[in-house]
A protein has these predicted regions:
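Histidine/acidic residue-rich metal-binding segments in metalloenzymes
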Residues: 131-300
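Divalent metal-coordination and catalytic microenvironments
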Residues: 9, 24, 45, 56, ...
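Active-site mouth loops of central-metabolism enzymes
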Residues: 55-68, 89, 117-130, 151, ...
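Metal-associated gating/positioning segment near the N- to mid-region
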Residues: 46-111
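Histidine-rich, glycine-flanked metal-binding segment
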Residues: 1-50
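C-terminal cap of metal-dependent C-N hydrolases
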Residues: 315-318, 371-426
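His/Asp/Glu-enriched, well-ordered alpha-helical/loop segment
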Residues: 197-225, 272, 293, 298-300, ...
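A glycine-rich helix N-cap at a beta->alpha junction
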Residues: 106-122
Length: 428
């Protein structure tokens, strides 16, 4: 088995250390480690993190391979420093059976760029009428533990209660896309001053907050786990904070774009800024940053949502909702959280690797950078500055809101069980 010596990297942003990888495992961490026959990476000034874990990725396969495949999506993930992603169920066919989740799991194994853990649908066809085969998906080769109808809300309270009760039996979690559909019919952007001035249908904060309030109470009643996808409002932060103070088993995620962008960008009518939940106000952005810093929000998740060119290069009302995010997430977090002093690099490792791995049960991921642990690692150059060029993306889609924007940081190397998937910033 080959050996690699990472020399002089700041492990989790701490003091410079050497890390010796032997095969799939970290063999030694310390200073002055002799290289021997190992390949040496000079990493002075760089940050070494555990491989990132994304709890919310849309890989689109099966069914929408025109926008992404498991292969292209995992290549994008590796480029962004990820060693594991959780693939959402809103594919065609929907991942609501053991057969479909096993197909996605197998495709992930074949890609080799990062581990893929399928997320199972909560309801058949994401229609909210009948529970999907939760037990069968859990017992399948994919071993599904996270279930979500993401893209749609499990808006029926009885259905949500039944789902929470069912997954409690095997320690699963329901990841809720919090959106009361009757309050968002025809919505095109955040409801507020900008939507009123532009004459666009508004997506009110209460449509998210009312579902979160209901579901944390249901989770408390059932004694089960609920995870809130892409939390986006200051009010949602307060509800989750209250729920945690009561000991309710709730976790929450925020996307990079909700940490940086606001609804003011919609004035351009550029559909690249159309996303669900929508970009909110500056007040919401600041509340989300503070909540991620203090732990009210547990993790950063990309909600990587690729779309083909024709679904975004059109008028606003006809455009699809969603943004790609795997290849820019870490840079946005560096800008919004590290360079503002809200998180250090150890905090980034916690929010983007340790905690998502625990929530999703990603075995071998989100582990300490120490001897005997799996060598799932990400090396980052924080001093790098560069404009985002989607033409260089590994993703099949280019719908990024950051095109031409200068962002800090660059993933130079990614290791999946000791094998380099990214070398010097390029896919291996």
């Amino acid at each position: 088995m080959s050996k690699t010596l990472i020399r002089g990297a700041k492990v989790l942003g701490g003091e410079p250390q050497d890390v010796l990888i032997d095969g799939a495992t970290v063999e030694r961490v310390g200073t002055g480690i002799e290289a021997g026959d190992a390949t040496v990476i000079e990493a002075q000034g760089q940050i070494l993190l555990p491989g990132l874990v994304d709890l919310h990725t849309h890989l689109r396969e099966p069914g929408r391979e025109d926008s992404e495949t498991v292969l292209t999506g995992t290549r994008a993930a590796a480029s962004g420093g990820y060693t594991a992603v959780f693939a959402m169920a809103n594919t065609f066919p929907v991942a609501d059976t053991a057969g479909v989740v096993e197909q996605v799991y197998r495709l992930g194994k074949e890609s080799g760029y990062c581990d893929v853990q399928p997320i199972g649908a909560v309801t058949v066809g994401l229609e909210g009428k009948k529970l999907a085969e939760l037990g069968a998906m859990h017992e399948s080769a994919a071993g599904v533990t996270v279930f979500s109808d993401d893209g749609k809300c499990v808006d029926d309270a009885v259905m949500m209660r039944r789902a929470l009760e069912y997954v409690k039996a095997f320690g699963g979690v329901i990841a809720q896309h919090a959106q009361e559909p009757r309050l968002t019919e025809g919505a095109q952007m955040n409801e507020g001053i900008v939507s009123a001035e532009l004459g666009l249908g508004g997506w009110p904060a209460v449509a998210e907050e009312s579902i979160i309030a209901r579901d944390v109470l249901l989770a408390e009643h059932v004694g089960s786990r609920v995870h809130i996808c892409h939390l986006s409002t200051a009010g949602s932060v307060e509800i989750v904070r209250w729920a945690k103070s009561r000991g309710i088993d709730v976790t929450a995620e925020v996307t990079p774009h909700h940490l940086l962008l606001t609804d003011e960008l919609v004035r351009s009518y550029n559909p690249v800024y159309k996303v669900n939940p929508p970009l909110r106000t500056e007040r919401d952005v600041m509340a989300l940053r503070e909540a991620l810093a203090d732990g009210t929000i547990d993790i950063v998740a990309t909600d990587h949502a690729p779309h083909p060119h024709e679904d975004k290069d059109c008028e606003w009302a006809a455009a699809a909702m969603g943004m790609v995010g795997l290849e820019t997430a870490l840079s946005v977090v560096q800008q919004t959280m590290v360079e503002t002093g809200l998180l250090d690099w150890a905090g980034v490792a916690d929010r983007m690797s340790f905690r998502p791995a625990v929530i999703g049960g990603a075995k071998g991921h989100g582990r300490p950078v120490s001897a005997g642990e799996p060598a799932n690692l990400t090396l980052v150059d924080p001093a790098y500055r560069g404009a985002v060029d989607p033409a260089g993306f590994a993703s099949r889609s280019r719908n990024t809101p950051y095109e031409g924007r200068e962002l800090p940081g660059r993933v130079t190397h990614t290791f999946l069980r000791g094998r380099a998937t990214v070398v010097d910033g390029k896919l291996a």
